[in-house]
């Protein structure tokens, strides 16, 4: 029906966090190390622990829970009934009760081994079960059934008390048998575990739930085969029979372990051999009947308290389970057990530890040879080892010390381990602190050996912390090892073992060694812690105190070690989680109060308050508290020696001390290493004070000694231990011993409250939470919850949500809190009511015992509406379970010495105080409501005023806007007027301007007068010149007439000359040689005749000079005409430089006309005319007038040829410019360059090398070189070059391409790349450096 937990299930505890993220208030943070079973499940945690310890995979947690509740009560009945056949019946009762299918001894053994394993399953299974169970518990009629089961359980607990006596007798008988069996089976870790299981089974008749839980807590893998389990069961039965009380106490411890099964599994593994030896020693040294009776009475009371506390712790574990996704620690498994069962088991374990302490003291230390093997690290453990350096240091220390002690003390160390483990659990089960007076005695002895143990304890604690990282494994191993010795202690050892899961592989001896050294360490560190729980338990159970007095030192050290280990482990995990959170926050989250990371940390701290501290670095709540915690830790050891007396003397002081330790728990957490060092340095004082603190506030002792490591391990148990610690504080003066009277505690708490008003005091808030949980348990869970809620009202909404978690977890924690008392108490309200920390805390330590007893008594009363509102799970279930658990605890307290009464008194006082504060809160709430109404009215008035003001403002703004517009219009008008005025002012001249104007006017008048005078002159001159012009015109006319006459004369003379020449031609023919001379002579004669004629004719003219002067222009015109008529005649001026020729020319001159402007015109016989201008220019006109040659004064020569060609010679540049009639212009330069400008705009330039360049009008150029190369330049700048060999080149801005006649094309790009395409299709590409990039050869 129910399968044993598999390794995956065992590991599922690590994954349970993902299953518990449904609660928004938990915000992804696991509030408690224990699995988040319903708050209703808190009370049923004992049953649930039993059932969950049995791996119930397919069962809904809610169903299994109700079933377990029924089975829990049934188990108790069956165990009571099965007292005689302890081994089979207890097995059956446990098995049958837990799960009917598990009825056989082997199965029971498996179940016993399974508990730790199943606790791991709880870790794995509980997440599912817890979530499902919470949902089912809220929705399922299981709540009603649970309440009924609680009532039945109370009845059955009473029956159990009666049956326990009978069972004790039977156990005594079977103990003797089992002692013989155990003596042979002690060496076997399974056997040692089996006796514990059996003893638990025998206890289970008294503590049916406890025994079953113990059985469930033991991992099934501890005993792989049923025969082993049977042997284990038989050994456990014998061991339990021999140490029934211790087993009962161990059951209580186991219950705590169930709360943190990993720790207990380790603790059990480590303590299993120790318990075996201790059981043997106890069986040998102590009459089984007496020890069993005393232990049984204690167990009965503790079972009831453990049931309540286990329920609370179960709840607490549910809270703890919410802390965060990290390696689940042993505390988770512990929380699975119901608080009552857990308390019972712890009580039994503590009693057994006391017995074992006595046996150890009597027999001496048992050498622990094997060094506990360390299991594989689980998720988060790798970092956790480093984050919890303290825990590791203690672990290493423990292991070393354990090795030393193992040689020195085997059984005593085993006892000390158990007791210390139980103390650790006792921290969880604060009731165990009642035994601290006795434990103190032993813790003194332990303080001696515990000092070594203390040093060892850190090592073991470190190992346990590592194991706590892998809680399920730790639990299982612890269960294996410690089961044989005593299941209660095994549960503590489970916690320890879960912490020391690494040590588990070496099973009994390694674990025992770890436990021993760890117990020693705890004896130093944890002796106070376990002493506190022990004193509480002692206060509740005088029999257990008697038993514990013998085992007190061992139990105290063991419990303290367990607690320290668990706390360190939990703290290590929390630190690891916080470290991971910090890393995550550094990457993703901004550190704001509203950030999810901060909320996670706060919730984690709340959950730490509930079960563990999240922060790797201890929160520094109050340095003052931390310092007191250090003195306490320093004084704990010395006080631990006197802790019994002090616990008796000042139970109240323990509460204040516990309060202070609670308040300083965070400080201790903050300074855990220092505190631990200080505690370890002054271990005697620290142990004593730790014992007081364990009684007062395990969290303080945990905080001070191993505040982080122990808190890691102990936070879950610390919840129960808080409750127990509260009750034991109240019950045990020793608990109050360190702090002084309990009243002082409250006073200090009030002061602390004032100090703790800083929200950082998580111990205080944990005290508040434990106080609230106690309140919830005690008077009225509803009222206390409402009270705590009212206190929490002072906190923010997050505090409320935390409160919800804390309250729900508190109900769980109430049981756990009674067990753990301070640590959990410190934490839950730490988060919940930071503001109310002081109040809650003050009340919490004061009423922790009362609330514990009252919560037990008043679990039945309905939870307050406030609590129900915030914690619906608390509505039905926490009442019945918590009430049932509280009643047994109250009964136990009643059965126990006046310490319980004092504790219940203190709880009642706390409840009264809480009620008073609630009234205050109500009054304050009323006043706040009035203030709120007043504020709302004031706000309404303010809104009206604002509206009126807005209206008025709008009106004013409109009016102002109108006024503004009007003013703007006025300003515009004024501006226009001003502009006109300024314009007029600018136009009106000033004095200087007027003077200037006057001066200018005067000047203008003067100029006008001058102008008139000049005009008169000009007019006279003009008239005179006009008359002259007229006269010159007349003269010109006369001269023209003369020219005409002279022209006629010239023509006549020329004709005569021709006639003469014609007559001379004959002679020329005859005389060729003389012809030229004659002709010249005739010309000369004719010239002379003409000249004579002219001379004769000219004198006859009236004004020959004028005629001569006026004639040249006519002659020039006639010469021009003549040359135009004969253009073919070459220009003569350049051709006649020779003076002789001039002479001849002079001879040929027929006439010479001098013009008035200085121009001289010469007429030659051949009809040519030469005109000499005054500036040196000479113009020659041919006879026909077609050829005209003009030689300018600067040397330039212009020739007009008969074909209309115009040749102009530039002398300076030696360039000839020839213009043809068709418009062609040819320029001949001196360099030989010839330019031709065609009419269409084309230009042809022929260079001296015969290169021809053609420039076209469209911008193209063509150059033809002598070799035949042609270069054409396109308009876009591209050049096309055609070579005479047929190659062609194209030059562009991007590339240059050459095309060869064979079809090869070579392209060179601007970047230097060359591309060659061959006719065959081959392409070769080269880079600028000539490297071939591509070459495709076809």
From Swiss-Prot:
Residues 781-790 have a biased composition (Low complexity). Residues 78-99, 190-211, 387-415, 437-480, 522-552, 612-790, 846-903, 1088-1158 are annotated as: Disordered. It comes from Pan troglodytes (Chimpanzee). This is Centrosomal P4.1-associated protein. Belongs to the TCP10 family. Residues 320-395 are annotated as: Alpha/beta-tubulin binding. It is found in: Cytoplasm, Cytoskeleton, Microtubule organizing center, Centrosome; Cytoplasm, Cytoskeleton, Microtubule organizing center, Centrosome, Centriole. Residues 401-410, 680-690 have a biased composition (Polar residues). GO terms for molecular function: tubulin binding. Phosphorylation at Ser-590 and Ser-596 by PLK2 is required for procentriole formation and centriole elongation. Phosphorylation by PLK2 oscillates during the cell cycle: it increases at G1/S transition and decreases during the exit from mitosis. Phosphorylation at Ser-596 is also mediated by PLK4 but is not a critical step in PLK4 function in procentriole assembly. The gene is CPAP. Keywords: Cytoplasm, Cytoskeleton, Microtubule, Phosphoprotein. Coiled coil: none annotated. Its main location: cytoplasm. Residues 542-551, 636-651, 718-765 have a biased composition (Basic and acidic residues).
